[in-house]
Amino acid sequence: MSLTNEQIVDAIAEKSLMEVMELVKAIEEKFGVSAAAPVAAAAAGPAAVVEEQTEFNVVLTNCGANKVGVIKAVRAVTGLGLKEAKDLTEAGGMLKEGASKDEAEKIKKELTEAGATVEIK
């Protein structure tokens, strides 16, 4: 009787954790292999997977010559009051933390069009 891979997987899925551990030990003994991942091979590759950044911080670095336009853009983006937006525009600093890539790019575009210098970190 020949079992398909799907039938084998289904049979293993029905077993308890202890039964699966016993099965792994039996396979290791029968075939002379180890289920443990080789440590040297995992640490050897310099081509480690780099996670793509998903959250971005938008920082105002310079308000430029059009200060009034930048203050309006800062208010629109952050929802701050006039005084707070003016202080942030003059001092520079964090506009938005944990923004998505699209949102960060949109904020940067709006403020750059108003004359500000903005960084996405």
UniProtKB/Swiss-Prot annotation:
One of its GO terms (cellular component) is cytosolic large ribosomal subunit. Keywords: Ribonucleoprotein, Ribosomal protein. One of its GO terms (molecular function) is structural constituent of ribosome. GO terms for biological process: translation. Coiled coil: none annotated. CDD domains: Ribosomal_L7_L12. SUPFAM superfamilies: ClpS-like (SSF54736), Ribosomal protein L7/12, oligomerisation (N-terminal) domain (SSF48300). Forms part of the ribosomal stalk which helps the ribosome interact with GTP-bound translation factors. Is thus essential for accurate translation. Belongs to the bacterial ribosomal protein bL12 family. Homodimer. Part of the ribosomal stalk of the 50S ribosomal subunit. Forms a multimeric L10(L12)X complex, where L10 forms an elongated spine to which 2 to 4 L12 dimers bind in a sequential fashion. Binds GTP-bound translation factors. This is Large ribosomal subunit protein bL12. It comes from Xanthomonas euvesicatoria pv. vesicatoria (strain 85-10) (Xanthomonas campestris pv. vesicatoria).
